[in-house]
Amino acid sequence: IGLTSIRFALDEKFEFAIIAIIFAALIDGLDGRIARLIKGTSKVGKELDSLTDMISFGVAPAFIMYFLFFVTLGRFGWLLCLIYVICVALRLARFNIHSNQEPSWKDNFFEGVPSPAGAILVLTPLILSLSGFDLIPINFDIIVPTFFIITSFLLISKFPTYSFKKIVIPRRTTIFLLFGIVLFFGLLLIYTFNIISISIAVYILLIPVSFLHFQKIKKQHQNDKIQDEDDLEDVL
């Protein structure tokens, strides 16, 4: 899918190039769960998944951004793209060797921005342009590279972001959730890049929220641990 996205970009069909990357992100969110359900996980599959992620969320977005925005920056533009691709590679490598010994409450958070989200974030200037947003007042030579670099380093940071892996949905709200999903995808089909732009804005706003939430839960668990140790000392 990543190579297909690059092909679309070469043909200057940037709408399809972005849609291909978003489609790859959706598949990436489902393939692991499906593999676990059918008990089809393997080390080879894990490595192949990382390889395809590297192309879809590393090489393809970097190529699109260089082709559209950074080619005029010369060597600096190429360096920006190299930094981003390296950050994606480091993130995927870290994910592959990540230990499963972390406390269960940490499963609700990623360390840093995941590579699918990072790919969509770095494409934000193009997505905003396709949604009809007026980008004329923006100084591309400063704002876009700065945003690109920040996103790159968020990929390899330890900044906690929501993983949405273990969301508990009350049964009584299931019908409303299904309605919301249908409505979202219906609007996505009609106002594709406007809805994607809004989704990006919501995700960016959730980054500091997830950090504060993480710190709150971490402090709570630390206090509980101290309390348990005090109770144990009292017993002894």
Predicted regions and their residues:
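Membrane-embedded alpha-helical segments that form the functional core of polytopic membrane enzymes
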Residues: 1-47, 78-88
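Membrane-embedded alpha-helical transmembrane segments of multi-pass integral membrane proteins
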Residues: 1-4, 31, 59, 87-90, ...
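Helix-coil boundary and interhelical linker segments in multi-pass alpha-helical membrane proteins
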Residues: 4-19, 55, 59-81, 124-143, ...
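Transmembrane helix-loop junctions in multipass membrane proteins, especially transporters and channels
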Residues: 10-11, 37-41, 69-72, 96-100, ...
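Juxtamembrane membrane-interface segments at transmembrane alpha-helix termini
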Residues: 30-37, 89-97, 157, 208-220
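Juxtamembrane helix-capping/reentrant segments at transmembrane boundaries
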Residues: 35-54, 102-113
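Alpha-helical transmembrane segments
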Residues: 55-101, 107, 113, 117-120, ...
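C-terminal membrane-associated helical module and adjoining short loops/tails
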Residues: 107-236
